[in-house]
Amino acid sequence: MPRTQTGARQRNRFPLETWEIIAMPTSSNYLVKGILPRTGLAVAWGAPKCGKSFKIFDLVMHIALGRNYRGHKTRQGIVVYCALEGGHGFINRIVAWKKRYLNGHDRSVPFYLMAQSLNLIADYKDLITDIDDQLGGDRPAIVVIDTLNRALIGDENKSEDMAKLIKAADALRVAFGCLVMFIHH
């Protein structure tokens, strides 16, 4: 380890882990074990019209309720779902899901829908403030951005535009210590 002028050990800005200590984490650093980490950035992608939004909505509802998802343990937490392709159609999905899985019982579920248009690059600070304010300081476990294309005012094929989007998503991740998931169009 480098030393300062006084001979004291200096803390490294970029510490290196030795081969011997590198191992799979034994703690519960997941939202959905074997599928989603507890924090970071994730992207759900697939062919157009293959049901990505339906599948991810089902997955995050299992997180909100703390229910196993297809045989995988979940860590219960608050879900913020930004439905940028129009809230009306998405509300129909929510109502259908409630009927199917909650048997018509309207119980409290830590799921929050945001169905306004969003330019994540320009609006991420306001989004962080509004989420924090409306959740009373509670932190979401996951923020879903559906779709990446709708959240990006720019070209997803330009590295400069994508770098700005990732920086904005990272700000959400850091602010809440959560997973940010994009659904690709």
Residue ranges of predicted features:
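Substrate-engagement module of ASCE P-loop NTPases
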Residues: 162-185
